[in-house]
Amino acid sequence: MRIVLITGISGSGKSVALNALEDAGYYCVDNLPPHVLPELARYLAGEGQHRLAVAIDARSSASLDEMPGLIRDLSREHDVRVLFLNASTQALIQRFSETRRRHPLSGSLSHDADVGLLSSLEEAIERERHLVAPLAEFGHQIDTSTLRANALRTWVKRFIEQKNNDLMVMFESFGFKRGVPLDADLMFDVRALPNPYYDHELRPLTGLDQPVIAFLDALPIVHQMIDDIHAFLMKWLPHFRDDNRSYLTVAIGCTGGQHRSVFIAETLAARLAHEANVIVRHRDAPVDVDASSRLVSEVDRP
């Protein structure tokens, strides 16, 4: 059975992800107590169900300590994938404010004044981060701070399309001026490279457009940067595998996340597609949803 566990911070998009999996044919359960999961998996398998998605959050805090062992045990019999959704505190506060929902851990905190509400919400978010932090190492982390709901649904679809039993590498381009990704395992700064932004004809384009590709591809220093990052990854990917890592997020950052980081993330993703399951995501580039997050397929490989 394929089991997808969705966990992370409240307000980061777990309901959106669960709905996307339901649309993909998964049997979905929200806020299932972790200790019930093995029994549910056995029951559904006996009923002929082959796909299960479960959302688990801090409302199950009394059982969260059991999760690492449960994940290991379930992985012996099932294809288990863990998706850990995260977002910045600022983004989470804005979402709770817009939806007027109360954080699930804020019930015992003061809500008497506006300042008290903000303080209580921040405290609840930080408390939840501490509670669910041990689960992050088992899952692929995705920072949804700047991700729209339709983009997250598309990303979840890409996530479940990956092949099993191998390391999944996500190359994520971003702009430093919008903050660093919360989900990065490795981060490379490519701001030292020539910037197409200063060419007025290239400024409105992205690293996916042919004129920008031609500009960067003609520069030896760009290829040196790509070769160095590629060599580092080729050397250390086996060690990540040996450490039983299932997921690795490699963040590539330039100033705005539109030109250089996009081109380099795409190039590295194509190169590494021979070595691992690869997803590429462009966090800040003004591209459509399908281009901003996709699984690198055979046709992308050089």
Swiss-Prot record:
Classification via SUPFAM superfamilies: P-loop containing nucleoside triphosphate hydrolases
Stored InterPro entries: P-loop_NTPase, RapZ-like, RapZ-like_N, RapZ_C
Residues holding ATP: 8-15
Keyword NADP: no
Binding, GTP: 57-60
Gene3D superfamilies: P-loop containing nucleotide triphosphate hydrolases
GO molecular function, one term: ATP binding
Tagged with keyword Nuclease: no
Keywords, sorted A to Z: ATP-binding, GTP-binding, Nucleotide-binding
Pfam family, one: RapZ-like_N
Family matches, as NCBIfam families: PRK05416.1 (NF003828)
Protein task: Displays ATPase and GTPase activities.
Family statement: Belongs to the RapZ-like family.
Protein name: Nucleotide-binding protein Bcep18194_A6125
Protein species of origin: Burkholderia lata (strain ATCC 17760 / DSM 23089 / LMG 22485 / NCIMB 9086 / R18194 / 383)
